[in-house]
Amino acid sequence: MFTYKMNVDAQEWDLFLQNHPQGNLLQSSDWSKIKDTWGNERVGFYKDNQLVGVANILIQPLPLGLSMFYIPRGPVIDYEDKELLKFVLLTLKKLAKKSHAIMVKFDPILFISKGLIGQETVQNSMTLEIVEELKKNKVHWTGLTENMAENIQPRFQANIHKENFSLDQLSKSTRQAIRTARNKGLEVKFGGLDLLDKFSFLMKKTESRKNISLRDKDYYQKLLTTYPNHSFITLSYLDLHNRLKEVEKQLEKNLKTAQKFTDKTKEGKVKDNQQERNRLEEEISFLKGYIDKGDSVVPLSGTLTIEFGKTSENLYAGMNEEFRHYQPAIPTWFETAQHSFERGAETHNMGGIENNLEGGLINFKSKFNPTIEEFVGEFNYPTSSLYFLFNLAYKIRKKLRSR
């Protein structure tokens, strides 16, 4: 016999999620504290008094006293259990009507395919069977969308699995980029609220560079304080004075080498020496410019990671564009993933990538040997006669905002 219960004990809730293959951060009991501008209901589904599914519902207020239910990366249930699925949908419809919700939107962890880049992709035929079962229960599937902006959550993500991650498993060019950054004086440290100001600074730099609007410092602080023992900031930085001393030593060595040149010295060797000198003098000028402005230690790149169960999520990342030539992003993301695995994670999700698997996101994230995971996408479950009118307006608004 199936039953449901509202506001399940948080400990019972999270323990269930942490042991479920679909368990994820967005369904955790504390996620509603992050999305506190929305309403929230947590409903647990029981079979013979045993918890068999959960749905962390975010409730978006709409005009005229209406609302919309949204269940990010949920509900978390066994979708192959048709009786359970039917009960969950009927329960959600009942709750939605009580809240005057026009529809229930959800995007569960159901994969169409998975695969490492360059290897054969594994298709999941069961997912499409589940889609057909949902359709039989009057749920609308938005389909295999082609544009990232068409979905709330990414339909494709780059997720590193622990067994596929080590320095040796990365490409030669990625390993070289990490070595080069370290040789240029880049250092990395981990922290929390103590690094918040520097991380926020980097995010503002990223906003300016990409001409986009991201989150503010208060939001990042909320993430860190809501998950105090399961969050961390990775920060790469450069000690300008130390780097200046090192480059000046290299220049001194370069000049001494040049003094030994004779008429018999090969032209190529002289040319290489001159090019190196130009590069070193240029970097010295660059560093002194920042030191003269009062800078000493400069943040270069940062990430903010939240952990839940055996998963970790690289939610936000920023970089100081003015120091791009130090190549800080690659070592920062590498250290973030490595630190996550050292802390017990089995997967490290780097977030969404382009649906057509072409572009800057996948080009960068593919450097870390991730598994590319394709989700089934979004479903809409109408719970009001106003659904079709609302959904049309919703799609138009989303299309306009993506321009």
Residue ranges and their predicted role:
Residues G65-E150, V298-G302, I306-K367:
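Acyl-donor binding region in acyl/amide transferases
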Residues K5-G65, F111-S113, I117-G118, K138-N151, ...:
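A conserved beta-strand-loop-helix scaffold within acyl/acetyltransferase catalytic domains
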Residues S208, F341, T371-E373:
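Bacterial peptidoglycan biogenesis and beta-lactam-recognition machinery
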Residues I102-V104, L202, T234-S236, H348-M350, ...:
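A general structural signal for short secondary-structure boundary/capping elements
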